[in-house]
Amino acid sequence: MEKFIIKGGNPLEGKITISGSKNSALPILAATLLTPEECVIHRVPNLSDIRYMLEILKFLGAQVHYEKGTVRIKSKIVHSTAPYDLVRKMRASICILGPLIARCGQARVSLPGGCVIGDRPIDLHITGLQKLGADIEIIKGDVVAHGGILRGTSINLKGKYGSTVLGTDNVMMAACQAEGTTIIEGAACEPEVEDLAHFLSSMGAKISGMGTQQLIIEGVKELHGCEYTIITDRIEAGTFAVAAAMTKGNLLLEHAPVEHMGSVLEKLKDCGASIEIESQGIRVSRSGPLRAFEIVTAAYPGFPTDMQAQFCAMATVAEGTSKIVENIFPNRFMHISELKRLGAMIELSQNQALIHGTERLSGAPVMASDLRASAALVLAGLVAENTTEVHRVYHIDRGYEKIDEKLSSVGANITRVYSKI
C-alpha cells in the first residue's frame, strides 16, 4: 500500500487542469456494450476505477485500447457473466447489467463493491429493469437476469433518499433498445446522467427530457459506434476549489465545469472565498478569514453529497460553528473520527455534524476510509501544522487523477511513499 506524507502550511498558487468526470466515464464505458461497433471516448481519467471497468469489459469480450485519455472500445461480447473477483472493487460495475440484458438477453453480475458509506441498495435498478420485462433474481450474491423481449413502460425511480443516479443510468441504457416508449419518472438530474444520455444519443438513441426528472426514451432496433468527449469532473474541481480557499491560495481551475458547480461555488463565496469566472475556467482565492457555514446535501442541483467531506474539512479551520446535514447517505461521516485526530472539534448526531472551527490543526497519522473521506484528510493535511500521514490512499486513486502531482505543481508539500499499513 501507499500513503501521502503532507507538510502543511503552503498556499496553493498556479493552475490545475481538471480531468474528465469519473462518474460520467464509468456508465459511458458500460454503454459501449450496447453496440458491436467501435466507440472512441476522449477525456477518460486515468483512475483505478476506470481501469477496473476496462478489465470487466475486456473479460466480457471487448477489445480495449486506452492511451493518453482516449479509450477505443469494440464490444464483441463472449460472456454475459461478470464474476465477483472483477466487480467487487467498485459500485459502478452494476452499470453493465442494463446493457448486458439489452444486448444479450441475459446477464449474471455479482453484487458490487466500492466505498463503504452506508446503505446503497440496488433495489431500484432491479425494479426498473423488471418493469421493462427482465426476469431478475438474486442467487448466491449474484444478480441473475433473463431479458427476453424488453418493452417500454412507465417507471418511477424515486427512492427514500432521492433519485438513484446509477439506477437511472441502468434503466436508461436498457430502455434504448426496448420495444416502444419508456418514460422514467423521478429520474436523476445529475450532469453525469445527462452526459450519458448525450452519449447514447450519439450512438443513435432517441432520448428527450435530458437533465430533467422525466426521461422519455423511444426504443430503437440497434445502436452504432460514435466518438465522444466526456464532461470535466465537478467534484474534482470543487475539491481543488476548497483547497485554494483553505490554504489562502490562488488557483485557476482550467476547464472546470462552472455550469455544474453552482451550489458549491455559492457556498464557497459565503465562506469568504473569491470566485472569478475566466475564459480558461474558474479562479478561486481567499484573502480574508474563512467563515462558518451551513450545508444540507441534496440531489442535483442541490449541494452534492460528494463534496460534504471536503467542506467538513474546511469547517474545521473556519471561524465559528458550521453545521452539515447529510440527507443522501446519512452514515457518510467516517472522516470525522480521523479529522479529530488532527485536532478538529466535531459533534456528530445521526445525520448532522456540528464543526467548531479551531485556529490550527496538528499533523498526525490518519486512515482513509473511502474516496471523498480521503480527499478531506488530504485537505486537512494541507493546512495542519507539522506532518500529516494519510494511509490507504488507494481510496483517493479511485476518483482523483494524480492528485499528489497536481497539488505538488501548485506548491503543496506532498509525497507518495510505500506504507506497510
UniProtKB/Swiss-Prot annotation:
GO terms for cellular component: cytoplasm. Gene3D superfamilies: Enolpyruvate transferase domain. Transmembrane segments: none annotated. InterPro entries: Enolpyruvate_Tfrase_dom (IPR001986), Enolpyruvate_Tfrase_sf (IPR036968), MurA_subfamily (IPR050068), RNA3'P_cycl/enolpyr_Trfase_a/b (IPR013792), UDP_GlcNAc_COvinyl_MurA (IPR005750). Pfam families: EPSP_synthase. NCBIfam families: murA, PRK09369.1. This is UDP-N-acetylglucosamine 1-carboxyvinyltransferase. It comes from Methylacidiphilum infernorum (isolate V4) (Methylokorus infernorum (strain V4)). The gene is murA.
